[in-house]
Design a protein with these regions (language model features):
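Alpha-helical residues within the helix-turn-helix
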Residues: 44, 61-62
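Short, Lys/Arg-enriched N-terminal segment that forms or immediately precedes the first helix
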Residues: 1-16
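Conserved segment of winged-helix/HTH DNA-binding domains
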Residues: 74-102
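Short, hydrophobic-biased segments on the C-terminal half of alpha helices
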Residues: 57-58
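N-terminal helix-turn-helix DNA-binding core of bacterial DNA-binding proteins
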Residues: 14-49, 72-74, 79-83
């Protein structure tokens, strides 16, 4: 059974992950593309370096906003980690937030 505390913790984790402009840009890109993308594609599309993209993707993955899978690219002869959005909805209202403190 999921408790109110667990619900609050999951909500806080998602809000924290979405609370950075670059992570919002990553989510927006994945939503627009509507397909799994690998790290280089994401970094190139957003004009950021791979290391920075990876840090933010890890945070989004830990929050359950994106998921990743490793796929062998036979053409390149290496494994690539692809990222895609996990469907999610965030509903916030004063009534919902009131329940948090009760």
């Amino acid at each position: 059974m999921i408790t109110v505390t667990q619900d609050i913790e999951r909500l806080a984790k998602k809000l924290d992950a979405l609370g950075h402009p670059l992570r919002l840009r990553i989510v927006s890109l994945l939503a627009r593309e509507d397909r799994p993308m690998y790290l280089n594609e994401i970094a190139n599309a957003l004009e950021i370096n791979r290391a920075l993209a990876k840090v933010h993707l890890k945070k989004l993955e830990a929050a359950g906003i994106v998921k990743s899978k490793v796929i062998l690219d036979e053409e390149r002869g290496k494994a690539l980690r692809f990222y895609e959005l996990v469907p999610f909805d965030l509903h916030l209202s004063p009534e919902i937030l009131k329940e948090v403190v009760e």
